[in-house]
Amino acid sequence: MDYLAKIYITLKPAVNDPQGVTVLGALKNLGFNTPVDVRVGKYLEVSLGAESEEAAENQVDDMCKKLLANMVIEQYRFDLEEVPGH
């Protein structure tokens, strides 16, 4: 089966986010006064083949832990969907 993993990687809540602070300041300078916090992260899409949904989940989890996310300062989550017609 073919799957598409949509991976969201963000800094852990306790980690300072200087990019988020910069974006928040820029939004306020542009007149957007409602945002009170901004956190910047990464979004990735990975297409993969696997024997089952569980196997695909395990592969994506390993990818995140071993390469895609810095487990010291980042956290991740992902959505997995089967790609029809492949």
Task: State what each model feature region is.
Residues 1-43, 47-86:
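Long, contiguous binding/interaction regions
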